[in-house]
Amino acid sequence: GLWETIKNFGKKFTLNILHNLKCKIGGGC
């Protein structure tokens, strides 16, 4: 359903932000 789609999108979005933060703090990927 729609809620599952929203949850999945939110999870991917959050993981993406965490990954970007790690890259900036860690100095590259």
UniProtKB/Swiss-Prot annotation:
GO terms for cellular component: extracellular region. This is Brevinin-2Td. Antibacterial activity against representative Gram-negative and Gram-positive bacteria. The keyword Secreted applies. Keywords: Amphibian defense peptide, Antibiotic, Antimicrobial, Disulfide bond, Secreted. It comes from Rana temporaria (European common frog). It is found in: Secreted. Coiled coil: none annotated. Belongs to the frog skin active peptide (FSAP) family. Brevinin subfamily. Disulfide bonds join C23-C29. Expressed by the skin glands.
